[in-house]
Amino acid sequence: LRELMQARVPQMVEQLGEFVNLESPSLDVAHLQHTAKYLADLFADVTGKKAEVIPGANGPHVHWKGSDDTKVLIVGHHDTVFPLGTTSTRPFSVEGDIARGPGIFDMKAGIVQAIHGLSAISDSSQVEMLITADEEVGSYTSRELIESRARATGAVLVLEPSADGGALKIARKG
């Protein structure tokens, strides 16, 4: 599996660059529609399975299921805190082993890696992934969907980046 994923790094970096340069500020529904479509297409290209784009008042969410009998939910978000136009001064870039750009850390890189990870495991039938459009503004329109899918699966992995020093986040603050 390690060799397979290592071989995919150039493809993942290219896809990450496309995703980062598609700006997705919270509450900018038009731009969030573009990133939702990009993610749905990426799911299809990488996994061979179709993802559903679910309309939301604050922007569309993207939902992919390995089957109708999933046990694990992976949650992420495609909205960012960066205002429209940020990529004109801070576009995606790679220097050595470091990629930079708006939204890369929270959480566009994790989403690209997770999609590739799902396609690389021999059986992803018990996994589903939900990428929401409003996490940075409180998840008000996605909360019910997240809670419903979490109850249905029973186990949830959130793609939130590590805390300072690489510590694993195990709870939501507040």
Predicted regions and their residues:
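Acidic/histidine-rich catalytic neighborhood of metal-dependent amide-processing enzymes
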Residues: 107-174
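Acidic/His- and Gly-rich active-site-bordering loop/insert found
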Residues: 1-104
